[in-house]
Amino acid sequence: VVVENFSPGTIARLGFGWDAIHARCPKVVMASISGFGQTGPGAGRTAYDLVVQGMGGIMSVTGTADGMPTKYGVPIGDIGAGMFAAYAIAAALVRRGTTGEGQYIDVSMLGGQIALLTYQAASYLATGEAPKAAGNAHSIITPYDAFPTKDGYVIVAVGNDSLYQKFCAALGMSEAATDPRFATNRDRVANKAAMYEHINTAMAPLTTAEIVERLDVVGVPCGPISRVDEVFANEQVQFTKQRRTIQ
């Protein structure tokens, strides 16, 4: 397997392009990772993570509706290209095991960002309307958002009507549980602002930990918004050894 991320055309000029390597070793799997692809009108452009996040649409759906477009907190443009290259290499190796043939793989940072648009891209392709940033909320499921608590914020992901009833019971929201405006997810989406008033009132006197404890008991997906130090202090993270010291 050969992996390279020179500017398009560079490795061929050095004598190690696909044609040269494949001629010597027909079984070779070669992956080229670049900003915009090996061919096409934009192939020669220079890419950095932030540039590709902007061009790939990710920033347009990240952040709040009334704020400026926002980049991910990690270099998802770089990471995405590497991940997709790894998947493609693994698939090429499986194919080689069957056919005995090598394969050339062209992965771009821009292409990776487009693939990560997932349902945002599907929504546009189905409706013709470009999705907009919506903060932490889900576009078609609610309550699915970050809510303020007595000492911070809590994430709640109420994915169906059954979970909504459990959510209301855990937080003592009996009125919201029976209000016909919130009976189904479609109703809740249509009356989101009114529902949020009930949720904010119920959560205001409770700490994040208290809310998580209540919702965990009834099986409602939830969690705190952790700082990086809090992530590594989490007992599940420690148990699964996500942090390891290598000698």
Predicted features by range, described:
Residues 1-2, 27, 221:
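Residue-level detector of anion-binding/catalytic polar loops
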Residues 1-23, 204:
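A structured beta-alpha segment of the ubiquitous adenosine-cofactor-binding alpha/beta core
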Residues 217-247:
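A glycine-rich dinucleotide-binding beta-alpha-beta segment and adjacent secondary-structure elements
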Residues 9-10, 35-36, 229-230:
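Conserved beta-strand edge residues that scaffold enzyme active sites
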Residues 16-17, 43-44, 188-192, 234-239:
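Short secondary-structure transition/capping segments
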Residues 142-218, 222:
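Aromatic-enriched alpha-helical interface/lid elements that frame and gate functional surfaces
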